[in-house]
Amino acid sequence: EFCGDCDFLADPTGWKTHDSQGNCYESDILILATANRLTTSSETAWLPLQTIRGQTTHMAATELLGNLRTAFCHEGYLPPPRLGIHCLGATYGPQDTNLDERSTDHVTNLTKLATALPSVKFPTATADLSGHVALRCTTTDYLPVVGPVPNKAAFNACYADLQAQKTRFIDQECPVFPGVFVLAGLGSRGLT
C-alpha cells in the first residue's frame, strides 16, 4: 500500500511506517518503490538518485502521420496515434520539479520532431496542444537501484577505506536493513 512520504522504523516484529494521515503500517518486508520520493526519506536520501522533469505533447494526428504503424524514434519519439492523437516527446529537465505544463516544452518537442522530419508540416501554435508532465527518477549512472536497502551508517563504516584504496578487494557483504528492498532509478523506463 502506498503510504506517501514517510520514514520507516525498525520494530521487533519487522518494520513500521506511518502515512500522512497518521495510520500505522507494520510488515516484516518493506518494498520502497516510490521513485524520486525516496530522496525525502532519511534512510534512502543518500542513494544516488536525481529527479528529471519530462513533458509530452499531445497532437492531433495528421493525414500523413495518422497512418504511422510503428514508433519513430529520434531525439524524441513519435508513436502511432491512439484515438486520433499522437503523444510525442519528451523534454528532459534535470532537477526541475515543476509539474506545470509549459508551452515552451511543447515547442521543444515539436522542434525536435520537425528537425527529424523536415518535409512534414507540424503545428507552430501551442495554444491547441495539451500534454502530460511527470517526474522521472534516475541514478547518476542511469542504472536502476534494485535490491536490499543499505544501512548508510554501517555502509560508510564498512567501506570507508575505499576512498583511499579504490582497488581494494571487498570481502564483506554490504550492511543492509533486513527485509527492506528498493526499486528505483528506472528513469524513462519505469512502469506506469
PLM region descriptions:
Residues A10-T13, L83-G84, N151:
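Short strand-connecting beta-turns/loops that link adjacent beta-strands
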Residues H18-F72, L99-H106, S119-T124:
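Central helical "cap/lid" subdomain
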Residues E1-K16:
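A conserved short coil-to-beta-strand element within the FAD-binding core of flavoproteins
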Residues C6-F8, Y77-P80, V146:
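A structural signal for short hydrophobic beta-strand segments in well-ordered beta-sheet cores
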Residues T62-G89:
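Conserved FAD-binding catalytic core of PHBH/FMO-like flavoproteins
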Residues P81-L129:
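Conserved FAD/dinucleotide-binding core of flavoprotein oxidoreductases
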